[in-house]
Regions:
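The substrate-binding groove and active-site-proximal loops of carbohydrate-active enzymes
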Residues: 31-44, 76-90, 159-174, 189-199, ...
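Hydrophobic faces of well-ordered beta-strands that scaffold small-molecule active sites
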Residues: 5-7, 61-63, 107-109, 192, ...
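Loop/helix patches that line or flank the sugar-binding groove of alpha-linked glycan CAZymes
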Residues: 1-3, 17-39, 243, 259-400, ...
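Aromatic- and acidic-residue-enriched segments that line the glycan-binding/catalytic groove
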Residues: 2, 18, 23-26, 72-84, ...
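N-terminal structural segment of carbohydrate-active enzymes
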Residues: 1-106, 114-116, 121-125, 175
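Active-site-proximal helices and loops of the catalytic beta/alpha 8
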Residues: 97-103, 115, 127, 179-182, ...
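Active-site-adjacent "subsite" loops/lids of carbohydrate-active enzymes
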Residues: 121-189, 197-198
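Conserved, mostly hydrophobic/aromatic
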Residues: 9, 53, 63, 80, ...
């Protein structure tokens, strides 16, 4: 998978279908969110908005976890073979995938295989049978009796008692997860995003890679050289996002340093750089509007980097209309469907970049070569076969020029 435009959806917060309108316990759709609330977004709601995504130019959606779980974020899996009832049914998911494919939209789902809920069948058996449980080696138990209380006496994720960590070195655990992946591959999904793979044993990652032909992207916050291409096709490229922040928002680096750091990222992933996500943000970060401090021109420039550099641009739901939100949980607010509240300056800019990208193979798949730089400005070419695009980017506050590069006589477009 390369050359796609990815749109990330947090299912509980994207769109609530009519059938969820009367569900008890839901907060009002536009009210402020917190870490515990359930807002009612569901799979049918996503299906209802596929025309919106098609019009925007999206070619793939990445869904945060949809498996049965207890929390609103669903990173605490209870059953890997069921859709969470708050989102719908397996039939609803099949219909969503089928509808996406009819609109040439691929579907990537979140695979949370490092940890589970305490209500996952294997951990429940440990709670019931303690040392006698045949699943006791599926987790790392420090002492008995095992209890779901603080401090936990079992290995867990992030100190959370509700997320016991699987022993991913265990061959039975590995076989179970491989079977889960094959099951969802049979549901015609196109890709898998692996949550916190840096905690998963290499032997399990190897089995995951060998068991499927699905596109695999890993959640990697730093250097992913260990993982790509051995285990993953690409990563969520937080390193590139951080680099663009340093240049465009903090302005703490010049063009020379930017180029050096980009070259390191590109060398890390090689050709697989085209399979990595260039992200505006995610469910784990503050929204782009917030870290740009409401500076629309800077936000537009940030988007230009994401769309003009190698990699697959990822738009986090709502960023394209100027939604606001600090870090989790506030970056997970409900999608604003009242168009009178949209920031059309941002929306039209993002839509225009998507159209530019989708109409130019050099931007989708081409190599990149820097051809000049000066202070806070650089120029580069994207080349794919006979197709070429030359890009000039100025992230400073004043007009600049690069000796030997003129636009006179050339067809060009000012993006920001």
């Amino acid at each position: 998978m390369k050359g796609e435009i990815i749109y990330q959806i947090f299912p509980d917060r994207f769109n609530k279908s009519r059938q969820n309108n009367n569900v008890e316990g839901l907060k009002e759709w536009e009210s402020e969110v917190d870490g515990q609330c359930v807002m009612g977004g569901d799979l049918i709601g996503i299906k209802e908005k596929l025309d919106y995504l098609s019009k925007l130019g999206v070619s793939a959606i990445y869904l945060n976890p949809i498996f049965q779980a207890n929390s609103n974020h669903k990173y605490d899996t209870v059953n890997y073979y069921n859709i969470d009832s708050s989102f719908g049914t397996l039939d609803d998911f099949r219909e969503l995938v089928d509808s996406c494919h009819k609109k040439n939209i691929k579907v990537i789902i979140d695979g949370v295989f490092n940890h589970t809920s305490p209500d996952f069948f294997a951990f429940k058996d440990i709670l019931e049978n303690q040392e006698r449980s045949k699943y006791k080696d599926w987790y790392t138990i420090f002492s008995y009796p095992v209890k779901v209380e603080s401090p936990p006496n079992y290995r867990n994720f992030g100190g959370c008692i509700d997320m016991p960590r699987l022993n991913t070195e265990n061959v039975e655990v590995q076989k179970y997860i491989v079977d889960v992946i094959k099951y969802w591959e049979g549901m015609k999904i196109d890709g898998l995003r692996l949550d916190v793979p840096y905690y998963i044993e290499d032997s399990m990652l190897e089995k995951i890679r060998k068991c499927t032909s699905l596109y695999i992207v890993g959640e990697i916050w730093g250097c992913g050289k260990k993982f790509v291409p051995q285990y993953f096709d690409g990563v969520m490229n937080y390193s590139f996002r951080d680099l663009v922040q340093k240049a465009v928002i903090r302005q703490s680096i010049d063009a020379s340093i930017f180029i050096d750091e980009w070259n390191f990222i590109e060398e890390t992933y090689g050709q697989n750089i085209h399979c990595c996500f260039n992200m505006s943000g995610s469910h784990d970060t503050e929204r782009i509007f917030n870290f740009c401090r409401g500076d629309i021109k800077r936000e537009k420039l940030f988007y230009a980097f994401l769309f003009l550099f190698p990699g697959m641009p990822l738009v986090y739901y709502g960023d394209e209309i100027g939604m606001k939100g600090e870090n989790d949980p506030y970056c997970r607010g409900t999608m604003e469907w009242n168009e009178s509240k949209w920031n059309y300056d941002i929306y039209n800019h993002v839509k225009g970049l998507i159209e530019l990208r989708n109409s130019n193979e050099a931007l989708q798949k081409g190599t990149i070569q820097f051809v000049g730089h000066k202070e806070m400005m650089f120029a580069f070419e994207r080349v794919y076969g006979e197709k070429r695009v030359k890009v000039f980017m100025n992230f400073g506050h004043s007009k600049q020029s690069i000796d030997g590069f003129e636009l006179d006589g050339l067809s060009y477009k000012v993006i920001v």
